[in-house]
Amino acid sequence: MRSLKGVALVVCLGLFFLWGAVLPGSSTAIPAFDPSKVADMSEYDPGKIVFPTGDTFKIGLMEAFSGPGAANGRYYWLTTSWNAYDYNKRGGIMVDGKRKMIEIIKGDTQSKPAITKKTAERLCLEDKVNVLWGASGSHICLVIQKVAEKYKTIYHNPMSLSPALMDGKNFNRYAFRTCLDTNMFGEAMAYYFARRPEKKFYILNQDYSYGHDMADGFKKGLAKHKPDAVVVGESFHPLFLKDFAPYLTKVQGSGAEVIFSGDWTPDGPTMVKQAVQMGLRLPVANLYIDNRPLMETIGGPTGEIMINANDYMVSVETPQNKAIIDIWHESSKDWSAPYDTDEWIWPVTIFGRSIDATYWMFDVIERAGTTDPEKIIATWEGDEYMGLVGKLKMRACDHQVIRDIFVTQFEFPNKWHEKGASYGKAIRIDSMYCMPPVADDLDRCKK
């Protein structure tokens, strides 16, 4: 078998120290992702991986592994198992005075809050997990967050964006969010469109807290960065919708120049596919609609309607990012089903974002040196880490990450997809232009 250690490192190691772990204007190093420490990933196969059991460091992966949202389970099994395999190949994670192998235990939410509660409780009480990790849907995350607090278990949320998760009503000390929130996304996208001519926007989002928060965040961003913009329509649809025609007909009649949508899989791809079929080829400002099969289905040039904003992109040019992309791409060539198609060959958006966040989490836990949640909390609060595409800072008072956001318009042709549009040059929006606000009712942030 080939060794992947040298694939990315020959070019990148020298550059790592130039990018690396020193903040601008400072000689003080901060912890950083180091590509030279990544294990040989040539034997990694997410379709076949089996984790050790027994005296392990246990992560409860909370995600939909069945039901209409099951694609998300496949996504995040891939990413968490990547991180765990890497660390296990290095000898495990150093905690409590010894190295422990990492075990990923699936917790199927079925995208249902009641099932989520039972599953999270089982993971805490029976499996004795050290960390709960997930999940798609802020309404699902809220349930996990409450269980984590009850059983004093660290909860890592690398994917769900509702600001309400970290407000005075719902915040708890055990929960940490390592991804952008809806306000950060809305501000970054509005900042980007302030430099484009379009002024008429139609908001089309999923009908639950996250979708409404996405709409509010974007409208606040427009008011701040593009005050002459007009929201010509606003619709919210049920999760896992099959027929978007009634909503897209409203968009057609609204005079909109851009569709703004925070929809995640399967709704986002379904919506865009049906919009194209109806002849509605407006720019789609989005977060999660970068699906490779969708881009191939709608055709290369058509995919250039996609404008994506996110906190990770494969097209961000840093030594760390280049290294992990090359290692991932080489490893993917030998993966088995369901990961044996070209959908998985690059660590796009949610893949790169979540492995970046989990490398940070492991780094924090090793620096804490223990599985004691109180010491992990103390280490993570206020922590700074140089990740794959830039600095991550955990705001101490509300456990919300502060980070730059990236925006790109999809291009065809491109490096990432031979048959469809994909990521173009990433425009970095500095965190000062998309700073997550602190909830007014979170008293601990007023001290």
Which stretches of residues belong to each language-model region?
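Periplasmic-binding protein-like
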Residues: 123-136, 156-158, 202-205, 255-265, ...
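Short, charged, surface-exposed loops that flank catalytic or proteolytic processing sites
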Residues: 366-378
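Extracellular/periplasmic periplasmic-binding protein-like sensory domains
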Residues: 272-355, 366-369, 414, 420-446
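Beta-alpha junction/loop-to-helix N-cap segments that form part of ligand/metal-binding clefts
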Residues: 40-47, 71-78, 90-166, 178, ...
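Solvent-exposed, acidic/polar segments of extracytosolic/periplasmic ligand-binding ectodomains
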Residues: 29-53, 57, 384-447
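Extracytoplasmic "Venus flytrap"
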Residues: 38-83, 107-113, 136-139, 204-212, ...
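Extracytoplasmic ligand/sensor domains, especially the bilobed periplasmic-binding protein
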Residues: 44-45, 114, 129-234, 283-315
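Bacterial N-terminal signal peptides
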Residues: 10-21
